[in-house]
Amino acid sequence: MKVAVLGAAGGIGQALALLLKNQLPAGSELSLYDIAPVTPGVAADLSHIPTQVRVKGFAGEDPSPALKDADVVLISAGVARKPGMDRSDLFNVNAGIVRNLIEKVAQNCPKALIGIITNPVNTTVAIAAEVLKKAGVYDKKRLFGVTTLDIIRANTFVAELKGKDPQTTNVPVIGGHSGVTILPLLSQVAGVSFTDEEVAALTKRIQNAGTEVVEAKAGGGSATLSMGQAAARFGLSLIRALNGEKDVIECTYTEGDGEHARFFAQPVRLGKNGVEEYLPIGQLSDFEKQSLNGMLDVLKKDIILGEEFINK
């Protein structure tokens, strides 16, 4: 099994690569690419960790050598948020980066499962889809926006509030991956109940958690360690599904039946070809229904921005 990480010298990329070196199945190959010349050194550094995962590092303009025959590609390349920016401010730089990388994915590993981490995910996934479509290799079941950070944050915050174990707390999060488009389904969390005030406060905190980290880092970056953890969890779920494990379920931002928007984060069952089954979002509370209806215009605009970036 070959996993490629694009943007591997960045804060998220290095955290992700460290976790994958430690957690990928024995015999896997971890292929690291970044435009930064330090990347082969990151690979050398990781290669000293005693696990049966081979690591190779590639730098420079062309990611092709890193991508050749990859089974899974995780893309974290791009600029990070600074205080005062929201994820959509990143669009101007990151849109072009994602386009260029996905063009190379289409050429070198068109059947790979692709996880997009680069923000703004609501838009960059649409960009990736349109690039793959133009190349004649788009399969909607193989392209994912990694929204797992919203899930792990929701699990953590709910567990903290209710005195539960965060590792056994499971909060589904649907919609998108920025601001109001992030919708935690708190009404579906087993074994806990919330007041209306708690729901409003928790929802807001989960939606704004990225900003909380950006501000706490005081200009020194955005969420890299928790995002690395989230991306590793999602990447390892893809690998488990590729290896034939049954009932691997994750929430992810993907092109489904289009009921709410062309791309929408929802629970899916993963399999050898990517999405095996789109799972229902279940019963929503009145607050959740209202929040869902209220965010769809924002989400759809984000998607159109990505489509038009490629098709204009």
UniProtKB/Swiss-Prot annotation:
GO terms for biological process: malate metabolic process; tricarboxylic acid cycle. Substrate binds at residues 81, 87, 119, 153. Keywords: NAD, Oxidoreductase, Tricarboxylic acid cycle. SUPFAM superfamilies: LDH C-terminal domain-like, NAD(P)-binding Rossmann-fold domains. It catalyses: (S)-malate + NAD(+) = oxaloacetate + NADH + H(+). The active site is at 177 (proton acceptor). Its EC number is 1.1.1.37. GO terms for molecular function: L-malate dehydrogenase (NAD+) activity. The keyword Transcription regulation does not apply. NAD(+) binds at residues 7-13, 34, 94, 117-119, 227. The keyword Ligase does not apply. GO terms for cellular component: cytoplasm. Homodimer. Catalyzes the reversible oxidation of malate to oxaloacetate. Belongs to the LDH/MDH superfamily. MDH type 1 family. PANTHER family: MALATE AND LACTATE DEHYDROGENASE, MALATE DEHYDROGENASE, MITOCHONDRIAL. This is Malate dehydrogenase.
